[in-house]
Every structure is written in C-alpha cells, then in structure tokens.
Amino acid sequence: MTFGRGCGEPRVTARKLRSSVLVLLAVGLVAGCSIALPPPRQPISAEARRAIDLLITRWQSVTDLRTLADINVERGGQHQRLTGVLLAKAPGSVRFEALSPFGQPFLIAVVHEGRLTAFSAATNEATVGDATAETTARLLSLPLEPRDLVAVVSGYAAPPDDLRMGEILPADALGPSLSLVGAVHEQRIWMDFQSGVVRQLQIIGGRAAATVTYRRDDEGRLTGFDVSAGERYVTGTVRYRNLTTGVGLSAKHFALALPKDAKTQPIR
C-alpha cells in the first residue's frame, strides 16, 4: 500500500485526523470523559441473566465483516463526510480506510492485538497506543474496549466481562431494556428478549453518553446505524453498502506497517 499524498488528495491536519477517527469509530464523540471507580457487584435476577446469556450467545457467533461505509457527522454545526472500507473481526480487531475521491486511502485507523493506530497518509503522521478503555477515552472521548468497537459496528452488544450489575428496566417508548454495569461504563440495551436482536444501545461513561440506533432492512439485515452524543451536540449516520459477513479475515488484514519516516506520537 502506498501512503504518499496523491495529486488533489485532501490534506488532513492533526485536528482533522482526530476528528475523523472520532467519526469512524462511531461512538467516541464527546470530550471530557473520565473513568469512574468500578461499582460493587450486585445480585442479578434470573430474568436478567437469561437476557445476558442470550446476548453472549449472539456475540459469540460473530466472526467478521467487510463493508463499504458512508459516514456523515455533524459536530457543533460542522459537517464531515467520509466513505471508506470497514473491516471488523471478533473479538477485537477493526480497520477503517477512508478513501479520497480518487480511491486512495488518506486516513487509516486500526485496532488490533490490543493496539490503536491512526495514520494520516496526507501528513505522514500517526497516533499510536494501547487499545484500552483509558486510551480510547483519551483519544475518542469514550471508554470502549476493542470488543465493544467490534460489537457496535457489527450490530451487536457485548456484555461486559467484568459485569457488576444487571437488571431489566421498565418499558419506555422503545420497550423494555437491559441495564448492564461493568467496571468501566454502563450499557443500556433495547432488544428483542426472545431473539436477542439489539435495536438500540446506549453507552454511558463518565460525563458522556452516546446512543447507537441500529438500522436493519425488512429482512432484519444490518444496514448501518445512527449515533448521537453530547445531548445531540454530535449526531451521525453510518450506512453500509455490500455488507458481507464470515469472509474469513485474518490477522494480516489488520496489520499496518507505517512508513519508516512517519511521525508518530503516543496517545495522551
């Protein structure tokens, strides 16, 4: 893959690089997020446990996906559009290549093997660090482990490994929901309690909250999702084209060898 800037290819500044990474990972959209101390564990009812087990079973069925993604975001009155190739592989690998009008990648972001790398081909700059809840909170402003990223782009919800609390909440306009509190953040999941299909996911971490609403066609196939955060200071849509699952992606599809002269900086 060639990382040089082509003729007419848009220049991506450090600010735009960070903004684009916010877009492609869909849920890191609000600044000022902090990670609270884990809450104490609480007993979980049998009904809630059945719902959790259903989510786990569906999550464990996820393999990989490949799709073209059209991303539109409005942030503080500013609009941004990206189109690119999105790859995801369970349990925790995601790659997005934003394409220029000429079809060349100008921004590449990869979460793989516990590392987070965002590279701008236009400026030859990269931001790298461990892909943990803390580092994604610093870069993406919301604490998301790699498995949560894969779950979101795949249309699922992955219950926290370190589950502290779980309860079924009374129905609202969207129906009943499941509240799951882990060591890092809280998830509220609106789902079909018979099939386990997730309709909407709210992720609450620190002072930030993001809501992901999945879009599916008449046959139930995932077509993308909408996202809002910061009391709708940020809103966005992600629409998939030619989505394929079970394509047999391997680790090589998520390898990103930076140019030797690339400027790198750690996630702060």
Label every model-predicted segment.
Residues D70-G76, P101-Q104, F119, H185-Q187, ...:
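Hydrophobic lipid-interacting interfaces of membrane-associated proteins
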Residues C33-R81, K260-R268:
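N-terminal leader/targeting segments and the immediate start of mature chains
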Residues A151-Y156:
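Scaffold/interface architecture of coatomer-like assemblies
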Residues M1-C33:
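Sec-dependent bacterial lipoprotein signal peptides
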Residues T57-L65, G77-Q80, L87-G92, A109, ...:
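Edge/loop elements at the starts and ends of beta-strands within beta-rich repeat scaffolds
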Residues G92-D148:
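An acidic-aromatic
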Residues M165-R268:
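Gly/Pro-enriched, hydrophobic low-complexity segments
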